[in-house]
Each structure stands twice: as C-alpha cells, then as structure tokens.
Amino acid sequence: MSQKLVLILNCGSSSLKFSILDPQTGEEKLSGLAEAFHLDDARIKWKLHGEKGNADLGAGAAHSEALNFIVNSIFPLDPSLKEDIVAIGHRIVHGGEKFTSSVVITDEVVQGIKDAVQFAPLHNPAHLIGIEEAFKMFPHLKDKNVAVFDTAFHQTMPEEAYLYALPYSLYREHGVRRYGAHGTSHFFVSQQAAERLNVPAEQVNVITCHLGNGASIAAVRHGQCIDTSMGLTPLEGLVMGTRSGDIDPAIVFYLHDNLGLSVEEINTLLTKKSGLLGLTEVTSDCRYAEDNYDKEASAKRALDVFSYRLAKYIGSYMAVIGERLDAIVFTGGIGENSSLVRELTLNHLKLFGYQVDSDKNKAARFGHEGVITADNTPVAMVIPTNEELVIAQDTARLCIA
C-alpha cells in the first residue's frame, strides 16, 4: 500500500538540506545535504532507509543540479519514493509581518517572501530558488507546496516586546521591529514539553533555549510566544557560533571611526568572526570549548560568556512570563549535547531554586532526553528538536485530505 510522504526542502545560500518523511508516523525515509554550491567541490550526501551514499555534483553546481541529482539519481534507488510524495514543504527563514502561520504557496506568497528578502538577504533568495526548482521538478504538485516560516511562531509577541525604541516611523514605514527566528523549533519543543509535563498545550509556560551555531531563546506563555531574543535579523540576542549577539550599538561607530572598518567589514566581523569563534580565537565549535574548559583560558572565557548571557535572558523571561513556569527547555545541537553549558547556565539560577542533577544532566545527550534537575526542584529538561517533522505535519495538514 502506498504511503503519503512529504518532501522537505531547506535551501540555504550555498547548501540544500532535504528529507522525506511520513507526517503521520514521523518515519524518515530519506535525508541528505548538498553543499559547497558554486564551488569546485560541490557535493551531496544522503541516507536512504539507513544506507548512506555520497557523490560529487560537479564544479559550480547549485540548487538546480542538486535537485536534479536527488530526482534522477537517488529516487531511482527506491522508485516508490517519488510516487509516494504528495506534497512539498519549504522552510522559510523570514516571513515578515505578513505570515502568522504556514501557507500553501501561491503567487501572492512568493511575493511576500520576496518582500522579506531585505530582512534575510542570504536565506530568502535561496528559498525562492528552491520553490521555483520544486515547481519545475514536480509540476503535478505545484499546488501542494507549503511555506513554513521560522518567524511565524513569534508573531504573537506583544508590541512592547517587538518594538525598538527608535522613531516609530521606522516601524510604520519600513517594518523595523523584532521578528525572531527558530520559531518552528521553539514551537515544537514547547508542545513536546507540555505533553511530557501533562500540561494542556494552550496552558504551558516554558522558556525554550534553541542553542546551536545560531542560538535563540523564547518565552512561551499559555502556549504562545511572548518574547524572543533574535530581532530584526538573527544577529541580536545570545552569543552564537560566529555571531556576537547583543552589543552596544555604538561599537559599530567605534570600529568605523577608530579602526577604519567599512560597513561591510563590520558586518563580517559581527556575523562571521565573533561569538564563540571570537572569544576562543580558535573555533566556533562549542565542543572544543567544552573539551578544553579546564585547560584553556580562552575556552573557559567563551563558555562563561555564553552561559552568563543565556542565564540573563532566562531570568528576564521569567519576569515577563509573570506566573507559573513549567520548565526551562534546552534544544538544538548545543542545548541537546552540552551538559557543561546547561550546568553553567543553571548554576546562575540558584536564586530561583534550580539544582542540576549531575548524573541526569550528563546522560541527556546524543538523542537522550529528560529532566536534568534534582527531584523536588524547578524543572529544566532536554528535548531534541524536530523541525522537519513540524514542516511535514503542517504541509500534510494543508495539502493532504
């Protein structure tokens, strides 16, 4: 009996992540990554029914060549795959204010994604390429393509949370406000937390920490986002792999006036040379800092700044939630796997009663989840994220009868 499967596309400026899921069971049939687009060593790797494969795409290859390879070289390894795909879900980083939920892609939706390019100049153009290529490769599914927006979950933020203290005309005329990111992940783990804590989803109060190379935190009250750390762009907020997060805005002028850096150079410094990379002066990889925390002053410095900033945000979000807090949730590559980051962060929150259970905390990694705080103390927990499943389920909800 044929299945109803969803193809998920996550197009970046130089890469394409793809997967095929059963939206009902969550079973992953195919997953893969095509990367190094526009370079001499463009390549693709995949896992089909547990079997791994890889290939070169050819010098200069990009999204079109990658999708061609998927359809013409990977799909034939299991001919039923293409036949069973009934819809396509696209991860879209920025939807501006226009999109508050996932939508079937129409000409109007495409225009809305184009309008938000100014807020995600690297990501949204790549998403548009992915949509165009999907229309070409799967013409029979043109009305079964769904856009799932990373910004949508944060559209419930109140005005006092999303406005900057800038001339209001900048918001009114140019849309300058806080939008957030990682919304699909924050939504998923908040819902999962509600289920694990036996709290109705519409009543759950959690602080969700999506920690990876990009990192953000969200305050979720009664199942809805009321604040998040990323802003107009994904540069604001927490310390990240190569991004600075929050800084004094006047540092930009200082770098220009005193060091002679151009706007482009400052942008590169803040987005690609800062964060853990800037603090360690070695790497953006949190695993290096964790492994060398007790050996290298730079590694300790990086994780201390990272966890201190995170704890400050958690404390402030406790205030804005303003009532019962059901849990602090850690997710993302660092959140799910770095017991040290979790311990350092929660140690800053002892005033609120948080007490790490060392054994539980160290056991919660590599896909293992659960509560990491001591019994009879406030709950902090690890929940692996699954953005692909959310995209598949939203796509199925809109397209599959």
UniProtKB/Swiss-Prot annotation:
GO BP term (any one): acetyl-CoA biosynthetic process
Transition state stabilizer, annotated site positions: H182, R243
Localization terms from the record: Cytoplasm
Catalytic reaction equation(s): acetate + ATP = acetyl phosphate + ADP
Keywords associated with the record: ATP-binding, Cytoplasm, Kinase, Magnesium, Metal-binding, Nucleotide-binding, Transferase
Keyword Kinase assigned: yes
Signal peptide as annotated in the record: none
Pfam families with a match to the protein in the record: Acetate_kinase (PF00871)
Cofactor(s) this protein requires: Mg(2+); Mn(2+)
Positions bound to ATP: K17, H210, L211, G212, N213, G214, D285, C286, R287, G333, I334, G335, E336, N337
Family label: Belongs to the acetokinase family.
Function: Catalyzes the formation of acetyl phosphate from acetate and ATP. Can also catalyze the reverse reaction.
Name of this protein: Acetate kinase
Protein's gene: ackA
